[in-house]
Amino acid sequence: MISTARVPADKPVRIAFSLNDASDDTPPEDSIPLVFPELDQQLQPLPPCHDSEESMEVFKQHCQIAEEYHEVKKEITLLEQRKKELIAKLDQAEKEKVDAAELVREFEALTEENRTLRLAQSQCVEQLEKLRIQYQKRQGSS
Protein backbone atom coordinates (compact mmCIF):
# COMPACT_ATOMS: atom_id res chain seq x y z
CA MET A 1 0.00 0.00 0.00
CA ILE A 2 1.36 3.42 -0.96
CA SER A 3 0.86 6.34 1.34
CA THR A 4 0.72 9.93 0.13
CA ALA A 5 0.82 11.38 3.63
CA ARG A 6 3.34 14.13 4.34
CA VAL A 7 6.53 13.12 6.07
CA PRO A 8 7.11 14.86 9.42
CA ALA A 9 9.60 17.75 9.19
CA ASP A 10 12.01 16.17 11.68
CA LYS A 11 12.51 12.99 9.62
CA PRO A 12 14.92 12.80 6.66
CA VAL A 13 13.43 11.98 3.29
CA ARG A 14 15.01 9.45 0.95
CA ILE A 15 13.67 9.20 -2.55
CA ALA A 16 14.18 6.60 -5.26
CA PHE A 17 13.32 7.09 -8.90
CA SER A 18 14.75 6.87 -12.38
CA LEU A 19 14.87 9.77 -14.81
CA ASN A 20 14.91 7.31 -17.70
CA ASP A 21 11.65 6.81 -19.54
CA ALA A 22 11.01 3.25 -18.47
CA SER A 23 7.92 1.40 -19.62
CA ASP A 24 7.38 0.21 -16.05
CA ASP A 25 6.14 3.08 -13.82
CA THR A 26 6.85 1.22 -10.60
CA PRO A 27 10.35 1.84 -9.25
CA PRO A 28 12.45 -1.23 -8.54
CA GLU A 29 12.67 -2.11 -4.88
CA ASP A 30 16.48 -2.39 -4.92
CA SER A 31 17.16 1.04 -6.48
CA ILE A 32 19.48 3.40 -4.60
CA PRO A 33 17.49 6.28 -3.11
CA LEU A 34 18.42 9.86 -3.95
CA VAL A 35 18.85 12.12 -0.99
CA PHE A 36 18.63 15.92 -1.05
CA PRO A 37 20.10 16.86 2.33
CA GLU A 38 20.96 20.38 1.13
CA LEU A 39 17.29 21.20 0.69
CA ASP A 40 15.21 22.64 3.47
CA GLN A 41 12.58 20.22 4.68
CA GLN A 42 9.74 22.20 3.08
CA LEU A 43 11.54 22.00 -0.30
CA GLN A 44 12.05 18.24 -0.25
CA PRO A 45 10.23 16.36 -3.02
CA LEU A 46 7.23 14.56 -1.63
CA PRO A 47 6.88 10.88 -2.51
CA PRO A 48 4.64 10.53 -5.56
CA CYS A 49 1.43 8.66 -5.87
CA HIS A 50 2.56 5.76 -8.05
CA ASP A 51 -0.96 5.33 -9.43
CA SER A 52 -0.89 8.82 -10.94
CA GLU A 53 1.23 9.51 -14.00
CA GLU A 54 0.97 13.25 -13.34
CA SER A 55 2.19 12.77 -9.75
CA MET A 56 5.16 10.76 -10.99
CA GLU A 57 5.99 13.44 -13.58
CA VAL A 58 5.76 16.23 -11.00
CA PHE A 59 7.96 14.19 -8.68
CA LYS A 60 10.57 13.70 -11.42
CA GLN A 61 10.51 17.41 -12.24
CA HIS A 62 10.87 18.29 -8.58
CA CYS A 63 13.86 15.95 -8.27
CA GLN A 64 15.46 17.46 -11.37
CA ILE A 65 14.93 20.93 -9.94
CA ALA A 66 16.47 19.76 -6.65
CA GLU A 67 19.53 18.49 -8.54
CA GLU A 68 19.81 21.77 -10.44
CA TYR A 69 19.43 23.64 -7.15
CA HIS A 70 22.28 21.58 -5.70
CA GLU A 71 24.50 22.40 -8.70
CA VAL A 72 23.67 26.10 -8.46
CA LYS A 73 24.43 26.09 -4.71
CA LYS A 74 27.80 24.43 -5.44
CA GLU A 75 28.56 27.02 -8.09
CA ILE A 76 27.58 29.85 -5.74
CA THR A 77 29.89 28.42 -3.08
CA LEU A 78 32.76 28.22 -5.58
CA LEU A 79 32.07 31.75 -6.80
CA GLU A 80 31.96 33.08 -3.24
CA GLN A 81 35.31 31.41 -2.55
CA ARG A 82 36.74 32.93 -5.74
CA LYS A 83 35.35 36.31 -4.68
CA LYS A 84 37.15 36.01 -1.33
CA GLU A 85 40.39 35.12 -3.12
CA LEU A 86 40.04 38.09 -5.47
CA ILE A 87 39.28 40.45 -2.58
CA ALA A 88 42.38 39.18 -0.78
CA LYS A 89 44.45 39.75 -3.94
CA LEU A 90 42.98 43.23 -4.31
CA ASP A 91 43.75 44.04 -0.67
CA GLN A 92 47.32 42.82 -1.17
CA ALA A 93 47.68 44.87 -4.36
CA GLU A 94 46.35 47.98 -2.62
CA LYS A 95 48.75 47.42 0.29
CA GLU A 96 51.64 47.05 -2.15
CA LYS A 97 50.49 50.20 -3.96
CA VAL A 98 50.48 52.11 -0.66
CA ASP A 99 53.91 50.68 0.18
CA ALA A 100 55.21 51.70 -3.25
CA ALA A 101 53.82 55.23 -2.82
CA GLU A 102 55.52 55.49 0.58
CA LEU A 103 58.80 54.31 -0.95
CA VAL A 104 58.48 56.90 -3.74
CA ARG A 105 57.92 59.66 -1.16
CA GLU A 106 60.87 58.43 0.90
CA PHE A 107 63.06 58.29 -2.23
CA GLU A 108 62.07 61.85 -3.18
CA ALA A 109 62.81 63.10 0.35
CA LEU A 110 66.19 61.35 0.39
CA THR A 111 67.01 62.69 -3.08
CA GLU A 112 66.22 66.22 -1.90
CA GLU A 113 68.27 65.71 1.27
CA ASN A 114 71.16 64.36 -0.85
CA ARG A 115 71.00 67.43 -3.12
CA THR A 116 70.98 69.74 -0.09
CA LEU A 117 73.94 67.93 1.50
CA ARG A 118 75.94 68.03 -1.76
CA LEU A 119 75.30 71.76 -2.00
CA ALA A 120 76.37 72.24 1.63
CA GLN A 121 79.48 70.12 1.02
CA SER A 122 80.33 72.16 -2.07
CA GLN A 123 79.94 75.39 -0.09
CA CYS A 124 82.12 74.00 2.71
CA VAL A 125 84.84 72.99 0.21
CA GLU A 126 84.68 76.47 -1.31
CA GLN A 127 84.89 78.13 2.11
CA LEU A 128 87.78 75.86 3.11
CA GLU A 129 89.65 76.80 -0.05
CA LYS A 130 89.15 80.51 0.70
CA LEU A 131 90.41 79.97 4.26
CA ARG A 132 93.52 78.14 2.95
CA ILE A 133 94.26 80.98 0.57
CA GLN A 134 93.87 83.51 3.39
CA TYR A 135 96.07 81.41 5.66
CA GLN A 136 98.73 81.09 2.97
CA LYS A 137 98.62 84.86 2.37
CA ARG A 138 99.12 85.46 6.10
CA GLN A 139 101.94 82.95 6.20
CA GLY A 140 103.57 84.56 3.15
CA SER A 141 103.27 88.10 4.52
CA SER A 142 104.78 87.27 7.88
From Swiss-Prot:
Give the top-rank taxon of the lineage listed in the UniProt record for this protein.
Eukaryota
- Could you state one GO cellular component term attached to this entry? nucleus
- Which stretch is the leader sequence? none
Cysteine disulfide partners in this protein: none
* Tissue specificity statement from the Swiss-Prot or TrEMBL entry: Detected in lung and peripheral blood leukocytes. Expressed predominantly in peripheral blood leukocytes and ubiquitously in adult and fetal tissues. Also expressed strongly in breast carcinoma GI-101, colon adenocarcinoma GI-112, and prostatic adenocarcinoma PC3.
Q: What is known of its domains?
A: Contains a C-terminal domain similar to that of the C-terminal section of MAP3K7.
Q: What is this protein called?
A: MAP3K7 C-terminal-like protein
UniProt gene name: MAP3K7CL
